[in-house]
Amino acid sequence: MSSPSRSVSLFERAQKTIPGGVNSPVRAFRSVGGTPRFIAKAAGPYLWDADGTRLIDYVGSWGPMIVGHAHPEVVRAVQQVAADSFSFGAPTEAEVVMAETLCELVPSIEQVRLVSSGTEATMSALRLARGFTGRDLIVKFEGCYHGHADSLLVKAGSGLLTFADTTQNAPSSAGVPEDVVKHTMVLPYNDADALREAFARHGKEIAAVIVEPVAGNMNLVRATAAFLQAMRALCTEHGAVLIFDEVMTGFRVALGCAQALYGITPDLTCLGKVIGGGMPAAAFGGRRDIMGFLAPLGSVYQAGTLSGNPLAVAAGVTTLRLIAADGFHDRLAAQTRKLVDGLAGIARDAGVPFAADSVGGMFGLYFREGVPTSFAEVTQSDVGRFNAFFHAMLAEGVYLAPSAFEAGFVSSMHDDAVLEATFEAARRAFKAV
């Protein structure tokens, strides 16, 4: 593969006007080292970088591109809407269709509010939970990332595992006062006993528990059914709001989201990524009595100039229609499992300590023995070995997430030929680590 000379020059240029040369930290390749690839275009399961090099894409814009890049029906829907202007700042029929679609696909959502980012969704859901309960304390879990709102930047996984000191139960970012995060209690992921103790001591103070039912921002870590069941029971018993952050898992692991896989009904759900089809879109919704506290009906304020943006809604509604096809998620899950099983077999043949797991169209690669079940176990992965593997795969034309602490994503366009090309690359790459 040729040297990414155009990406090198673009990165040098970008750093003059953009902090770190990127608009989201993980894109800078700081975790893995080297120069980030600047992308010129994408189609199906492929990216083309600024030098014209084609790459098999397992990032998928960090999850949204579940039907592949530039799907013709999604592109056509956006083009048709764009001809009538990009934004109105007023209600549209299309956003009603989006809301109806979300409520139909996710039974726990009785009403929904559209926003523009996952951070807005989680931030607003927590404000709503506090307004509804009249309480302040929020419970989150180590390694779960819920966006970059101040009160949630505590042991938050994702890029913060690369950029922050994770040994302290303190803000994971400069600029976040300790007075802000004092209302956030951080507990170990998958530890139901710790959650029971927290409720025993602080049950009357806890407004909400927020969780990724499948964590995707400390690599991929599944919640156990017992953990989520205990969480649901404790929230019900103590009058706290259970919030599932399904910004990443929503519609990617199942048509009914992770809550359908586990059979757990949250009070509020946060969505994003897939519901925008690659455009900036997110949402939060749930029980009607809770959602009724939102302005203009209630006293909990939330607003957004571009909320329900027509272009994003068009892309999202079309994507949701495509993935609602019979068998879509069964095929996606089977293909993703085929990918991780194949990679695990190749690593085993190469004698490399390695494990892999998948849920729906998400997957995790771990340079360690055994699939991790907690934040602590994830941080025991061999980051140096992952970094070497990442660069070896990139040199072979396979683009993985540039961090040992991020999940990967498969689209419906990753067919057997794409997987076999990935396996051929991996056979050579594992020899380099």
UniProtKB/Swiss-Prot annotation:
UniProt key word Repeat: no
GO-annotated molecular function: glutamate-1-semialdehyde 2,1-aminomutase activity; pyridoxal phosphate binding; transaminase activity
Gene: hemL
E.C. no: 5.4.3.8
Obligatory cofactor(s): pyridoxal 5'-phosphate
InterPro entries, alphabetized: 4pyrrol_synth_GluAld_NH2Trfase, Aminotrans_3, Aminotrans_3_PPA_site, PyrdxlP-dep_Trfase, PyrdxlP-dep_Trfase_major, PyrdxlP-dep_Trfase_small
Pathway membership: Porphyrin-containing compound metabolism; protoporphyrin-IX biosynthesis; 5-aminolevulinate from L-glutamyl-tRNA(Glu): step 2/2
Protein localization: Cytoplasm
GO terms, biological process: protoporphyrinogen IX biosynthetic process
Binding partners and assembly: Homodimer.
Entry superkingdom: Bacteria
Residues recorded as bearing N6-(pyridoxal phosphate)lysine in the entry: 273
Family named by the database record: Belongs to the class-III pyridoxal-phosphate-dependent aminotransferase family. HemL subfamily.
Protein name: Glutamate-1-semialdehyde 2,1-aminomutase
Keywords per UniProt: Cytoplasm, Isomerase, Porphyrin biosynthesis, Pyridoxal phosphate
Keyword Cytoplasm in record: yes
GO cellular component: cytoplasm
Substrates-to-products reaction catalysed: (S)-4-amino-5-oxopentanoate = 5-aminolevulinate
